[in-house]
C-alpha cells in the first residue's frame, strides 16, 4: 500500500468519525479520543491497542510506548493494518465503514497486537512478546503465537477462539472465521504448523493440523478437520476433510462464499483426502 492509499484510508476514517459524532452526540467524546484527535492511523492504533490491552501490571502508557516504538522501527506494520481494514470493509457485509474495524472488531485488534508481538519476537524481546500474546488471548479470546508469520489483507471474522501456532504461515489476502485452529499434531518441536497460501478462505470451526499446505485460492468448509495437504483452487470439507469441488473464484477469501459449489462427493464418516 502506497503512502497515498494509506492517507486515503485514514481520511475516510476521520470523515466517518466526524459524521458519526454529529449523528450521535453521546459518543462524540469517544470518537474524539479514539480517532479525531490523532494525526495519523499509527497514532490511533497505538492509542486503541494500549487501552484495550492495559492491565495493572502494564498500564496503557507503557503499552503505547512499545507500540509506537515498533511502528517507528517498521512503518510497514501501519500499512498492513490499513490493508487489513480494507479487507474487512470489502469482505464483511456487516461492515459499511472503514472506521468499524479500528473501533470495534476484536479480530482486527488481535491481529494488530500480534504484529507488535511479532516485531518484539524478531527483536529478541521474547518475554515481552509472550506477555503481549497472553494479554491478547485473555482480552480478545484469540491466541496467535508471536513467531507465526502473517501477511496483510487479512480478515479474522468474529475471531473468537482462533488459534495460530508458532510455525504457522498465513500469506496475503486470507480470510479466517471464528474458532479456527492452525495447530500441530503432537508435542514434537520444529516446523509443525500449517502453511496457508494466498487467497484462502477457512470456514468457521475448521481445524487444520500439522505441517501441511493449504494451496493458493483453496476453500476449507466450516467444521472441517484437515490432516492432509489441500491442492490450490480446491474446496476441502468433512471430518476428516477431502476434496469436494472447486471454488468459483480465484481467491475465495474475497467473495466469502460459504457454499460448496460443484460438490463431487457424498460424505461418509471416515472419508479423507
From Swiss-Prot:
Covalent S-S links between cysteines: none
Subcellular locations according to the entry: Cytoplasm
GO CC, one annotated term: cytosol
Pathway(s): Amino-acid biosynthesis; L-cysteine biosynthesis; L-cysteine from L-serine: step 1/2
An example Gene Ontology biological process: response to X-ray
Known catalytic reactions: L-serine + acetyl-CoA = O-acetyl-L-serine + CoA
Record keywords, A-Z: Acyltransferase, Amino-acid biosynthesis, Cysteine biosynthesis, Cytoplasm, Repeat, Transferase
Cited PROSITE patterns: HEXAPEP_TRANSFERASES
Cross-referenced CDD domains: LbH_SAT
Domain of life where this protein originates: Bacteria
Chain coiled-coil ranges: none
Mechanisms controlling activity: Sensitive to feedback inhibition by L-cysteine.
Main localization (coarse): cytoplasm
Family annotation (SMART domains): SATase_N
Family from the record: Belongs to the transferase hexapeptide repeat family.
Name of the protein in question: Serine acetyltransferase
Organism: Escherichia coli (strain K12)
Gene: cysE
Amino acid at each position: 500500500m502506497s503512502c497515498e492509499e494509506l492517507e486515503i484510508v485514514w481520511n475516510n476514517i476521520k470523515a466517518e468519525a466526524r459524521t458519526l459524532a454529529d449523528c450521535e452526540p453521546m459518543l462524540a467524546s469517544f470518537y474524539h479520543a479514539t480517532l479525531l484527535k490523532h494525526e495519523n492511523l499509527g497514532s490511533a492504533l497505538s492509542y486503541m491497542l494500549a487501552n484495550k490491552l492495559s492491565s495493572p501490571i502494564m498500564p496503557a502508557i507503557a503499552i503505547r510506548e512499545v507500540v509506537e516504538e515498533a511502528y517507528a522501527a517498521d512503518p510497514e506494520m501501519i500499512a498492513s493494518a490499513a490493508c487489513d481494514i480494507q479487507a474487512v470493509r470489502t469482505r464483511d457485509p456487516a461492515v459499511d465503514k472503514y472506521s468499524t474495524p479500528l473501533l470495534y472488531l476484536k479480530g482486527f485488534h488481535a491481529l494488530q497486537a500480534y504484529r507488535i508481538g511479532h516485531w518484539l519476537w524478531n527483536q529478541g524481546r521474547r518475554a515481552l512478546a509472550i506477555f503481549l500474546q497472553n494479554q491478547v488471548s485473555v482480552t480478545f479470546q484469540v491466541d496467535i503465537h508471536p513467531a507465526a508469520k502473517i501477511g496483510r489483507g487479512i480478515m479474522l471474522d468474529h475471531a473468537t477462539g482462533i488459534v495460530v501456532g508458532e510455525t504457522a504461515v498465513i500469506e496475503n489476502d486470507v480470510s479466517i472465521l471464528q474458532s479456527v485452529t492452525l495447530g500441530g499434531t503432537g508435542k514434537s518441536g520444529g516446523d509443525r504448523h500449517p502453511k496457508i497460501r494466498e487467497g484462502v478462505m477457512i470456514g468457521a470451526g475448521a481445524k487444520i493440523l500439522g505441517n501441511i499446505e493449504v494451496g493458493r485460492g483453496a476453500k476449507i468448509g466450516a467444521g472441517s478437520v484437515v490432516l492432509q495437504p489441500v491442492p490450490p483452487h480446491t474446496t476441502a470439507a468433512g471430518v476428516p476433510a477431502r476434496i469436494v469441488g472447486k471454488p468459483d473464484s480465484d481467491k475465495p477469501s474475497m467473495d466469502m462464499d460459504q457454499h460448496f459449489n460443484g460438490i463431487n462427493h457424498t460424505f461418509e464418516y471416515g472419508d479423507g483426502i
